């Protein structure tokens, strides 16, 4: 294996420190009485996996020597934990069904590696000095839907959903910036079936989203560039890992469709619409 122009040996035909282990737990419960239905689901997934030392961090042949244990996990390694909690609530009347979903997710990923840097001015962190990268993404989601069957041939569906995300970071290195993201949308869909051969449907939806990305700079890179003789304009350009962004988006989508089934062997579909997708 060649890493950063250095040939890294593989002893005993085994990639050292590539073992891993994981644990998962799931829980689900449901309750139903007459027109009311409810459920709750909880899951948690954890994984820890080692990285081959010969392809991560500063090349060091001494770290590749066999330690006699093919299952241990040493630096460098990654840890990932995903927690998910969701609940579904529904109540049905004679001609109307109302349902809602609420959810929460936490995605936490960390990468650990012996502290290393490209710049001599970057000090060893006082807390968790070997934590290279960490991402903590929290997601909250909500949706509500209504279905109304006013007549046997006419059906209406309404919906509203929202989601909020927040990502925070830590560690002595950088990969992704901190950000907040909010999205929401409302929709209406109607379907008319005068008989078993014809179906006409139409709908409209409006979506809105806001993205806020936090700025992140590298002062140690800026110092290095200044020492190398770069002018202030170049230093200011390269020092930022991410720039501050605060943008909002919103637009509508609509569609109209017809399905005609004159016989068991023939079916004609016609659809026309306009779509918008949040970035």
Q: Over which residues does each language-model region extend?
A:
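Hydrophobic, lipid-facing positions within transmembrane beta-strands of outer-membrane proteins
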Residues: 23-27, 81-87, 138-144, 182-188, ...
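Transmembrane beta-strands of outer-membrane beta-barrel pores
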Residues: 3-5, 33-35, 44-48, 93-95, ...
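Structural signature of Gram-negative outer-membrane beta-barrels, strongest in the C-terminal barrel
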Residues: 151-163, 171-279
């Amino acid at each position: 294996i060649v890493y950063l122009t250095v040939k890294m040996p593989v002893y005993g035909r085994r990639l050292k420190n590539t073992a891993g282990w994981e644990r998962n737990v799931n829980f689900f419960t449901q309750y139903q009485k007459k027109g009311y239905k409810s459920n709750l689901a909880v899951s948690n997934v954890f994984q820890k996996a080692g990285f081959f030392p010969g392809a991560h961090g500063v090349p060091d042949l001494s770290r590749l020597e066999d330690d006699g244990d093919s299952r241990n996990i040493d630096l460098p390694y990654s840890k990932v934990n995903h927690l998910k909690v969701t609940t579904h609530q529904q109540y049905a009347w004679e001609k109307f069904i109302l349902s809602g979903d609420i959810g929460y997710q936490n995605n936490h990923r960390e990468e650990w590696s012996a502290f290393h840097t490209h710049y001599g001015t970057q000090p060893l962190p006082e807390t968790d000095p070997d934590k290279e990268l960490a991402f903590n993404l929290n997601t909250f989601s909500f949706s509500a839907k209504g279905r109304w069957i006013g007549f046997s041939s006419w059906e209406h569906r309404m919906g509203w959903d929202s989601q909020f995300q927040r990502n925070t970071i830590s560690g002595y290195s950088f990969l992704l910036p901190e950000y907040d993201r909010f999205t929401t949308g409302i929709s209406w869909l109607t379907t008319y079936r005068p008989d078993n051969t014809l179906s006409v449907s139409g709908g409209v939806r409006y979506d809105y989203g806001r993205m806020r990305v936090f700025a992140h700079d590298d002062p140690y890179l800026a110092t290095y560039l200044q020492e190398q003789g770069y002018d202030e304009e170049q230093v200011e350009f390269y020092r930022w890992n991410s720039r501050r962004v605060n943008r909002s988006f919103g637009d509508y989508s609509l569609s109209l469709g017809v399905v005609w089934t004159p016989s068991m062997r023939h079916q004609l579909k016609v659809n026309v619409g306009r779509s918008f997708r949040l970035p």
